[in-house]
Swiss-Prot record:
InterPro entries tied to this protein: DEAD/DEAH_box_helicase_dom, DNA/RNA_helicase_DEAH_CS, Helicase_ATP-bd, Helicase_C-like, NPH-II, P-loop_NTPase
UniProt name for this protein: RNA helicase NPH-II
Chain location of the short sequence motif DEXH box per the record: 300-303
Protein location: Virion
EC top class named in words: hydrolase
Length: 678
């Protein structure tokens, strides 16, 4: 029974399971194995009710201080003996010598001297029922949603959740995986509640049973830690934490079991009274630096292969015994299953069945041009988009999402479509600051709204009234001092399609040949220095310990040698990585020196405000590029062909843009910005 979730501890989804208070009469009527279930209440009661409990004497009855509102002095506990009678109305036992003791006090004293759940008899179970009722621990298939008020100190009831992820059978499956302390790979289509419900379920399990070595040994020495849901972007941290808070009946984060962790957090997001058993929503960067502060680590959007996320996975495997549980959540295993099975040989795969709540139909619009003929392909694609939106139009008060690959394409497509269609057009991507205001306008629009977006909308924001997706099937993959546009992967297609079908039937219209879809190995497009630096911090062997290995091992070795040339010790690197963003590797030289220059550069990385001190610090790094040639790119812009003169990528040519036709040299400020050397 230790690895199985008793049904009285199901999370109350308020559809099939509700909070329930069990009476002593119901306990008497139960079969022995049904009564046994209540023994597991020992663990949450020890944590949340008995952690500061002691024995008092109230009107000649031994009780616990937590059972009475009276301020009574600590009493010497009685010697326990088997009760000879009981009063179920008063919830009291009477022993051979006439001592009266409450059911819960008897259970407390029994657990204090017991070492195993097997030591608890029916007399002890009665007190566990009383303590569990006070904590609202138990559930049943009957009850009221109103009874969820106060479970976590929440002022409002829990939300009703009919999703598959909180179905009792799925709760049992997830619990068994969690309690076995092995890596869990959780899959499920978009819309089954992976991100919105599974972390909430794991919070519930941690609240009940977290901090104990196993569920058979009784101990009052609880090593309780919070759990963490680690996400690749700040927008996701805010979105999913707000969703969970609301679903647990909270109006604000203060005094809730939820905490947020991301860079430059405003005071409104800080929970000053966070619970030890709670859940932290964190960006990958901060999770990596605080990884062992958590009992359960949940990594979401694993299929995206965010660089820091992949590093976390590598570190978790190296130190898996330091974690109680690891959950990797992904919409699809299309591209990753074989590697995960190789990387985590003891992993458990759990799939949440079912798709979105509503059906999603598909339509394919063929482009007659070869995608290699980019200009002709794009021109026909835009015409096809216009015709498709006319043919497959969202209903009034609904919206459609057009996926393009870049921010600049958002502007181009919006202008093209708005000149040919009578609908309201919006642009949403990661650089837009007022997304909530835009969503309010979209929801208030009585007509049809069309949103042009980058892959940002695949997961970062849920558009509640979206019914149609128009997918160009492309994504821009940045690379050091460049990048290129490629067709999306199967997992990205699934994510985009899953943006609809949540609140009403949806439609997915795609404008690409599915035979073009390929897995995207992002590590081959990335700066590799973070893999090298964190391998120093966590003693990883490269490339053996990496979750995804780069194709070009020579480049990895070049990065290792380049970092070695900085002459910065591993201890200093550890300090720098936990203190600074270090978006540009060379900035570490300034941070290692410290002083005013380091403070100014740090402020620039955090705020974008380039002061004279920060500029001087950057200039001291000699990050130069030579201008080879220039050409006019538009009315007010010139394209500068440049050759990089520093770092691992020295010799690489790239294009920069400026309002003037420059010659000579430029100094790189960031990967994408520079100042001319006049």
């Amino acid at each position: 029974m230790e690895n199985h979730l008793p049904n009285i501890f199901y999370f109350p989804n308020c559809v099939t399971t509700f909070p329930y208070r069990y009476t002593q009469k119901e306990l008497d009527d139960m079969k022995p194995d049904e009564r046994e279930r209540f023994k597991y209440a020992t663990f949450p009661i020890i944590k949340h009710r008995w952690s500061h409990a002691y024995v008092v004497k109230d009107n000649h009855v031994f009780k616990l201080n937590v059972e009475t509102s009276k301020r009574l002095r600590r009493a010497t506990p009685p010697t326990l003996s088997v009760p000879v009678s009981m009063n179920t109305m008063l919830r009291e036992y009477i022993t051979q010598d006439g001592t009266k003791i409450s059911f819960e006090c008897y259970s407390y004293l029994t657990c204090k001297k017991a070492t195993s759940l097997h030591d608890l008899d029916d007399n002890a179970i009665r007190g566990l029922v009383e303590g569990g009722n006070r904590l609202q621990l138990f559930t049943n298939s009957v009850g009221s949603v109103k009874d969820t008020v106060g479970i976590f100190g929440n002022p409002n009831p829990f939300m009703k959740v009919p999703l598959k992820s909180l179905h009792p059978s799925m709760q049992c499956k997830i619990f068994e995986s969690w309690i076995h302390h092995v890596p869990v790979v959780l899959t499920g289509d978009t819309g089954v509640g992976k991100t919105s419900q599974v972390p909430k379920l794991l919070l519930w399990f941690n609240y009940l049973f977290g901090g104990f070595v196993n569920l058979s040994t009784i101990t009052f020495d609880v090593q309780e830690k919070p759990i963490v849901l680690s996400l690749p972007r700040v927008a996701l941290v805010k979105l999913h934490s707000e969703t969970l808070l609301t679903s647990l009946g909270f109006n604000e984060i203060h005094k809730s079991p939820v905490s947020l962790k991301f860079g430059n957090m405003q005071e409104q997001f800080v929970n000053t009274r966070f619970r030890r058993y709670g859940i932290v929503f964190s960006t990958h960067k901060i999770t990596l630096n605080t990884l062992f502060n958590y009992s359960t680590v949940i990594l979401d959007e694993v299929h995206e292969h965010d660089q820091t996320g992949d590093i976390i996975i590598a570190v978790c495997r190296k130190y898996i015994r330091k974690l109680d549980s690891l959950f990797l959540m992904t919409a699809t295993l299309e591209d990753d299953r074989q590697r995960i099975e190789e990387f985590f040989t003891e992993s458990v795969f759990v799939h949440i069945p079912g798709g979105t709540l509503f059906s999603i139909s598909e339509a394919y619009v063929k482009n007659s041009n070869d995608s290699l003929n980019k200009f002709m392909y794009i021109e026909e694609e835009k015409r096809n988009l216009v015709n498709a939106i006319k043919t497959y139009t969202p209903p009034k008060q609904s919206s459609g999402i057009v996926f393009v690959s870049t921010v600049s394409q958002c502007d181009v497509y919006k202008q093209y479509l708005s000149e040919r269609l009578p609908y309201k057009f919006y642009i949403i991507h990661g650089k837009i600051q007022n997304i909530n205001d835009l969503l309010s306008d979209i929801y208030d629009n009585e007509g049809v709204s069309i949103i042009i977006s980058t892959p940002y909308l695949e997961s970062s924001v849920t558009v509640q009234n979206a019914t149609h997706v128009y997918d160009t099937g492309r994504v821009y993959i940045p690379s050091p001092y460049g990048g290129r546009e490629v067709f999306i992967s199967k997992s990205m297609r699934d994510q985009r399609k899953g943006r609809v079908g949540r609140v009403k039937p949806g439609m997915y219209i795609y404008f690409y040949d599915v035979s073009e879809l390929r897995p995207i190995k992002r590590i081959d497009f990335e700066f590799l220095h973070n893999y090298v630096l964190y391998s120093k911090v966590f003693d990883l062997q490269l490339p053996e310990d990496l979750f995804v290995k780069p194709t070009n091992m020579t480049r990895l070795r070049d990065v290792i040698e380049y970092i070695r040339s900085f002459n910065i010790s591993d201890g200093v690197w550890t300090r720098l990585l936990s203190s600074y963003y270090i978006h540009i590797l060379e900035y570490a030289k300034v941070y290692a020196r410290g002083g005013q220059s380091a403070a100014a550069l740090d402020s620039f990385e955090r705020t974008g405000n380039l002061t004279d001190d920060a500029l001087d610090a950057i200039k001291s790094l000699n990050m130069r590029a030579k201008i080879i040639s220039h050409r006019k790119a538009s009315t007010h812009t010139y394209a500068l062909m440049c050759r990089l003169l520093f770092g691992v990528y020295a010799g690489k040519t790239f294009i920069a843009y400026h309002k003037r036709p420059l010659t000579g040299y430029i100094t790189m400020i960031t990967e994408h910005s520079f100042i001319p050397e006049y």
